[in-house]
């Protein structure tokens, strides 16, 4: 079976948006128009199309899949779903890794919101080219040009409209295509399946010419030959303009911008045309960086059908019919179903039972998957999100994804005994799907704790327990994940010796403990020379320290950001053992940390509050009471924006307090930023409470 769509006709795109910008509707409409069996533009009685929509409504094409395949004008588009909430930035980051391009959807009324800024930053970080779709042009207060300004000011981007709206709110009927210089007007009777290409309305001609001029200028800057032609006063032809838009979009010097109303079925086809005209094929993006697991050297993986198979597992979902689905983006080579594949991240072989391609309303079993495609693998047992699957002959690790540690924990209890086992299984499955979510058992109380990136993240997990796994769970008070670290350097020795008849125990170490940069983690350095401690006992010392650092000396929280140097010691021919050196290492570490000026650290959240000016004073006063540090204040659409770092422990219940302080007009978003030192008076309370 040869590949159906050549690599240069594939588009892997994501639709990234703030929660209310209309992402789902846009995705659904894309699937609707690409799935319509007749060619759009043939004359049909609108009824057939209408029925199709109604049926789909009853069955509901909601994109529940992580990646859906559809076709438009001989191109294959793989739509990768990206979540729209800040607690799930890990998901967004991961989908950014496997996308080649993105459509950023903004609401024509709400414009650029805090979440859209986060997603935009992540797309910049991974170098994802994008086009902007201004949605909801039919809403009251819709203003395309406002959004254009906000993108310039807030996202510091360079938007270049390639179509502009005809009308707005309830008079929005279509768009002016600035490349062709024609008006495109949608026909309400056919659910927008049919549209007419007309001359530009006279009252908009001036504006259209003005924006066309901006577009041509932006295009000319992409290419010297075009620039000469433009400066010489010659007209650029349509092909040249399209080529220039694509160049500018791919090198991210500007962002093509379109508008429409997905809900009212206007502007979706023009958006699809822009996706295939301007967003990159897998062959047009930079080669993917990887690491050779044998040599640890950097290697580059080129998107092509030649070469050994290499792909990245980016999402795991549990499907009621086929079990676990592992979604994989294939970067190089091809793979047949039923064959073996090597997981280079885990150093394990896995067998691929089936390969499934997801369409909006059906699944298709395929025999082979090729470079540039996205496909669900069935039958993988050990593969988790972020793992690389490849051919053992040419192994590569595509990504060492850094998954953030949870900043908040909540105890969960099943409501009935019968749910206990079900809950364990369900939490295990959810943890496999989402690496930023952790499950652990609290030793002292035996309670199950779940950890995540914020209150909302955990609320959604508890909600999924109920909906998908039918487990009713009670949740406890949220607990913050504190950490400990040290502020000064100390050297300590510890001799662990038990030698009273029979086989004794003997381990003796000298260590130096030093603080490191915040966020840099733990480092162990071996400076033993002349065999004063035999080689085979060195890892035991390291292991002893790693076990001891899980329980800090202040309040039993994990200790972070320090370096231990093992520089001297002694051993006994008969009585020394790994166990003895492990204990010696762990005791030396505990004694050293007591003397090294230990301090408590807490998660600091980056908080952004948006309020009308009259509540500004109250909100800032409240953030100060919560030990917040105010970083900046801005204006946005007549509202005041306050940016601050606030300790997570002070933020519980903030949404209710903010609502009552601003009569429901204030909104906020927060995400974890860094660990900061807890002031000593508060640290004292926390320590006393822990030791209780």
UniProtKB/Swiss-Prot annotation:
Protein name: Elongation factor G
Claim: Protein biosynthesis is one of the keywords in the record: yes
tr-type G domain: residues covered: 8-283
Compartments (UniProt record): Cytoplasm
Coiled-coil spans in chain: none
GO cellular component, one term: cytoplasm
UniProt keywords, alphabetically: Cytoplasm, Elongation factor, GTP-binding, Nucleotide-binding, Protein biosynthesis
Family according to the record: Belongs to the TRAFAC class translation factor GTPase superfamily. Classic translation factor GTPase family. EF-G/EF-2 subfamily.
GO biological process: ribosome disassembly
PROSITE patterns, A to Z: G_TR_1, G_TR_2
Keyword Repressor recorded: no
UniProt GO molecular function: GTP binding; GTPase activity; translation elongation factor activity
Task performed by this protein: Catalyzes the GTP-dependent ribosomal translocation step during translation elongation. During this step, the ribosome changes from the pre-translocational (PRE) to the post-translocational (POST) state as the newly formed A-site-bound peptidyl-tRNA and P-site-bound deacylated tRNA move to the P and E sites, respectively. Catalyzes the coordinated movement of the two tRNA molecules, the mRNA and conformational changes in the ribosome.
Sequence positions that bind GTP: 17-24, 81-85, 135-138
Family annotation (InterPro entries): EFG_II (IPR041095), EFG_III (IPR009022), EFG_III/V (IPR035647), EFG_IV (IPR047872), EFG_V (IPR035649), EFG_V-like (IPR000640), EFTu-like_2 (IPR004161), G_TR_CS (IPR031157)
